[in-house]
């Protein structure tokens, strides 16, 4: 495929499957001499440190499902099956960056509930579930910085597609396609980021035109406090509904 100019986007869960894919990419890179193919592996829930190094060396994009990193019920059976040490490799993110790889986030929709940008940023930065009490992730060293969490949803995606000259960042000459949120993902308190996942984005812009615009949310301090108290219950309803609220 690579010889014909096609990229391979592989879905692999276990460390054996990912090892096989990394070996195939290594062979392809050595045969073609092209270290900028940007083949990608998604899910990658268990990856050995040695293979993470190959992700960096051979330009394999790490499409990580770090939204599943907290110890939620769906992941409760992992550690008893693979052992405590291998469980620490679950849903890696920062370790791929340390190995020189590019990390991209994904939601796995429709297999999993449709997760939005605030949810993805919050779980990437904290490795915890927003708004509800749950055990933290077993591997907090995999937490991303806020900047890297945003790159995983924007500029790194464009890079994976070989489209970094057209999209992914706000620059003159690039496509003006963007979503606007009523939250500062870099500077706002993480509780505010978590709360924003239940609200619509402020606007959607396509080709420089506003195609969706929400009414500004106005409330008193008392109304805001009441909303914050309701958020855990609302979030549990949202998480249980595959289509969201």
Feature annotation, model-predicted:
Residues 1-90, 98, 104, 182:
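Active-site core of metal-dependent hydrolases
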Residues 12, 102, 109-245:
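Active-site microenvironment of metallo-dependent hydrolases
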Residues 93:
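Glycine/threonine-rich phosphate-binding loop and adjacent beta-strand/alpha-helix elements that clamp
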């Amino acid at each position: 495929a690579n010889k014909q100019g096609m990229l391979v986007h592989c879905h692999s869960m276990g460390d054996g499957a990912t090892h096989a894919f990394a070996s195939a990419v290594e062979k392809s890179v050595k045969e073609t001499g092209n270290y900028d193919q940007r083949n990608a592996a998604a899910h990658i829930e268990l990856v050995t440190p040695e293979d993470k190094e190959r992700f960096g060396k051979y330009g394999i994009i790490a499409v990580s499902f770090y939204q599943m990193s907290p110890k939620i019920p769906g992941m409760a059976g992992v550690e008893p099956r693979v052992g405590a040490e291998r469980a620490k490799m679950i849903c890696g993110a920062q370790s791929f960056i340390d190995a020189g790889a590019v990390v991209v986030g994904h939601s796995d929709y429709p297999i999993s509930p449709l997760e939005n940008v605030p949810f993805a940023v919050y779980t990437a930065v904290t490795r915890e579930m927003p708004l509800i009490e749950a055990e933290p992730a077993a591997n907090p060293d995999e937490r991303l910085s806020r900047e890297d969490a945003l790159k995983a949803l924007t500029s790194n995606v464009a890079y994976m597609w070989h489209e970094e000259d057209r999209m992914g960042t706000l620059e003159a000459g690039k496509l003006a396609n963007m979503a606007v949120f009523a939250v500062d993902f870099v500077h706002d308190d993480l509780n505010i980021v978590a709360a924003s996942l239940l609200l619509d984005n402020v606007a959607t812009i396509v080709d420089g035109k506003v195609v969706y615009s929400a009414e500004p949310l106005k409330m008193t301090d008392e109304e805001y406090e009441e909303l914050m108290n309701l958020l855990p219950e609302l979030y549990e309803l949202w998480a249980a509904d595959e289509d969201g609220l």
